Amino acid sequence: MCQEDEYDYLFKTVLIGDSGVGKSNLLMRFTRNEFNIESKSTIGVEFATRNIVLDNKKIKAQIWDTAGQERYRAITSAYYRGAVGALIVYDITKQSSFDNVGRWLKELREHADSNIVIMLVGNKTDLLHLRAVSTEEAQAFAAENNLSFIETSAMDASNVEEAFQTVLTEIFRIVSNRSLEAGDDGVHPTAGQTLNIAPTMNDLNKKKSSSQCC
């Protein structure tokens, strides 16, 4: 096996939200440090990967991006299967994209594992002069629904690294706690397998009390 294909954990993380909110550019910025101002709407599903190291463990982050249009909803179940993290993205300049966050969250919780780590992401902060959704409104929604929250710009890279790292670190923390409680040295899934996490409610309560993003 090639060295770049070796890893201790594979974390599947999904990007969801309305079409045009910048999901594909967030994916490109995090995995390749690129931005395409003429990016077109995703057709179907695509994903990219990036390897990171947390606590001396090699993590392969597999980030999935899907079309936000209704006609692609048939792929929903397969898209969410095995996901341990999710970023719900809206456009801070487009109120309707934020208004639809509740629907995306409902769909996520219907199809994904109940213990998935979720972050609400307000994208396009490079367009602050066009802001339609206040930070306070989004923070309130996130707090009410037990989500972490951050605002980003895929164009100038603001907070993109922090957003993904926060989600991946929280997944890793939960996995590490599960391993410690089981009394073993850590879980090492075979390459190519997605690791499912199942934190207790105590884990989730600790998360809310100990971490607030932005």
Curated annotation (Swiss-Prot):
Keywords for the protein's UniProt record, in alphabetical order: Cell membrane, Cytoplasm, Endosome, Golgi apparatus, GTP-binding, Lipoprotein, Membrane, Nucleotide-binding, Nucleus, Phosphoprotein, Prenylation, Protein transport, Transport
PROSITE patterns named in the record: RAB (PS51419)
Family listed: Belongs to the small GTPase superfamily. Rab family.
Pfam families membership: Ras
Residue positions of motif Effector region: 39-47
GO biological process: ascospore-type prospore membrane formation; endosome to plasma membrane protein transport; exocytosis; membrane addition at site of mitotic cytokinesis; mitotic cytokinesis; protein localization to cell cortex of cell tip; protein localization to meiotic spindle pole body; vacuole fusion, non-autophagic
Keyword GTP-binding set for record: yes
Name of the protein in its database record: GTP-binding protein ypt3
Localization: Cell membrane; Endosome membrane; Golgi apparatus membrane; Cytoplasm
Function description: Has a role in retrograde traffricking of proteins from the endosome to the Golgi. Involved in the secretory pathway where it has a role in acid phosphatase secretion.
Binding positions for GTP per the UniProt entry: 17-24, 65-69, 123-126
